[in-house]
Structures are given as C-alpha cells and as structure tokens.
C-alpha cells in the first residue's frame, strides 16, 4: 500500500547562511564527522553529534558541489530529513509495541508533537548490509517487482551520488481499504563506515504534478538504518522509521493497523527477494 522504503521530515532552507564563506569548509567536515559517529555502537551518541549544524548545510553544498538553487534545495531536504530521523530514533523513551511477530520482528510506535504518530520496525536480517543497500538503492526502481505494496517507483532526478527525487505509486490493499496513493519524495542515501542510511521526505517536482484519480499522500520523517549485527557481521540490524499522512477520511485505527502491518510485510518481502537473489547467483555460478 505504501512505498516500502524511506521518506522524511520537513526541510529548512537557511538561505541566509549560503554566503557565509568561512563556514563552508567547517560545515562539510562537521557533517561528515557527525555521520561517521552514527556508525558507532552507541545509539545515544548519535544525537549530540547530529543535531548541531543543520544551519551550515546550504553553504557547503553550494560551494563544494556547484549545484543550482533547486538542486541545493533537494539536497538540503534530504540532509535535514536524515538528521530529523536520527534524532527520533536516538530517543529510546516513549515507544509502544504495536506488533511482535513470531520470528521476532517488532513494530513500535510513538506520538511526536511536531510530527504525529511514527512507527519503527526493528528486525534482524540474514544478509550483509552492503547487499541490502544495493537492493534498496541501486535497484530501487525494481521494488514493484517484489513488493506487492508498491506498484511503481520511478527516479525523476538524481543530484550527485546521494540524493534523488522519486515518484512512488502504492499497490492495492486487501479489500481496497485504502485507495490508490502516490508520493513524490526526496531521498538521501549515505554510507558511513559499515552503516547505511536511507532517508527521505515529501517534496514537489515540476515533472510530476498531482495525478487524476490518485490521492497525493505525504511522508516524513522516514529513514532506514542498516548496521551489521554485533554478533555476526553477515547479518544486519535493520531499523525503519516510518511516518506517513495518507490524506483523505480514513479512521486512525485503520491507518495504524495498515502502517504497522505494511512494515512487517515489507521485512518478509525483502527477505524473500534477497533469498531469490542468492538462488539466482548460485545458479549463474553453476552454469
């Protein structure tokens, strides 16, 4: 029903910071240092390092990459989205259990005053994080092939190696409980050390106005974090923060059930996709 990946918070432009030349080099170093800290073992250390310098983003982006104003805006939205998500994930208090599956997959939720209700999927996957990153980022447009909750994902624009704007169309829900929805999202994909981050938020793009017969939903904050398991580097601790406004007159009880179940379903579909990929590789090697 929903794009099975990652989208996220509200970006802030900070236009007044763009021309502060002296901050550009320091901003770039600081942001990269903060994200490297996220790959460390202690989740509580994420926040103190990530919150501080969001106001320095635009000057380093424009100077170092040479992007135009629209591209800078997309990159900033993705960067801010990542910071907002990590802040939410770093706060371990106040989470309520929604689902605990038989295999240990867990969905938690929390209500935030500036965001609304957010959901957090926590699973352990028998895959290396590098392989998962390739599937979810490198093969993003193939998601509709293996996830029935997603009809289509299309990349509208790429900005550098870490930012893209996408259009996603949701798949049908059982009984058509929730009608067709689509999303235009900016996505930020980063790898720092052995940890992978996939974040995003709703945005607008001139090539994809609202479509007739489809409700344009909004998402954010959303982020996937993939870290090797401390017990086995061939397994991945997979966390997915999800926040979506489906729009329309849908009872909250239905929305909550649909969103939490969507996360559980996504984990199962992803496992099956990766298992199928492994079989295909083994068959190719045997030929």
UniProtKB/Swiss-Prot annotation:
UniProt xrefs under PROSITE patterns: START (PS50848)
Single GO biological process annotation from the record: cholesterol metabolic process
Compartment annotation: Mitochondrion
Gene3D superfamilies: 3.30.530.20
Reaction(s) the record says it catalyses: cholesterol(in) = cholesterol(out)
Any one annotated GO CC term: mitochondrion
Keyword Transferase: no
Transit peptide: 1-61
Domain (START): residue spans on this chain: 66-279
UniProt keyword terms in alphabetical order: Lipid transport, Lipid-binding, Mitochondrion, Steroidogenesis, Transit peptide, Transport
Pathway listed: Steroid metabolism; cholesterol metabolism
SMART domains linked: START
Pfam families to which the protein is assigned, alphabetical: START
GO molecular function: cholesterol binding; cholesterol transfer activity
Annotated function: Plays a key role in steroid hormone synthesis by enhancing the metabolism of cholesterol into pregnenolone. Mediates the transfer of cholesterol from the outer mitochondrial membrane to the inner mitochondrial membrane where it is cleaved to pregnenolone.
Subunit structure: May interact with TSPO.
Family annotation (PANTHER family): STEROIDOGENIC ACUTE REGULATORY PROTEIN, MITOCHONDRIAL
Protein name: Steroidogenic acute regulatory protein, mitochondrial
Organism per entry: Oncorhynchus mykiss (Rainbow trout)
Gene name tied to this protein: star
């Amino acid at each position: 029903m929903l794009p099975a990946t990652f989208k996220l918070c509200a970006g802030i432009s900070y236009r007044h910071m763009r021309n502060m030349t002296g901050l550009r080099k320091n901003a770039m170093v600081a942001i990269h240092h903060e994200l490297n800290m996220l790959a460390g073992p202690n989740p509580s250390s994420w926040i103190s390092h990530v919150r501080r310098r969001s106001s320095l983003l635009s000057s380093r982006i424009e100077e170092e990459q040479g992007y135009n104003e629209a591209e800078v805006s997309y990159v900033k939205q993705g960067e801010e989205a990542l910071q907002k998500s990590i802040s939410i994930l770093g706060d371990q208090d106040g989470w309520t259990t929604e689902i605990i599956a038989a295999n240990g997959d867990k969905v938690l939720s929390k209500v935030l005053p500036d965001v609304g209700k957010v959901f957090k999927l926590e699973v352990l996957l028998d895959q290396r994080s590098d392989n998962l990153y390739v599937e979810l980022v490198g093969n993003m447009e193939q998601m509709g092939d293996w996830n029935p909750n997603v009809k289509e994902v299309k990349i509208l624009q790429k900005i550098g190696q870490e930012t893209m704007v996408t259009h996603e169309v949701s798949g049908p829900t059982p009984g058509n409980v929730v009608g067709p929805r689509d999303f235009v999202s900016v996505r930020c994909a980063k790898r720092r050390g052995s940890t992978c981050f996939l974040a995003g938020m709703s945005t607008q793009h001139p090539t994809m106005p609202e479509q007739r017969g489809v409700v344009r939903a909004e998402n954010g904050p959303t982020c996937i974090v993939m870290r090797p398991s401390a017990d086995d580097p061939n397994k991945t601790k997979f966390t997915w923060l999800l926040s979506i406004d489906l729009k329309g007159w849908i009872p909250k009880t239905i929305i909550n059930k649909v969103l939490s179940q969507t996360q559980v379903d996504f984990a199962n579909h992803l496992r099956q996709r990766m298992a199928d990929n492994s079989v295909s590789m083994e068959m190719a090697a045997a030929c």
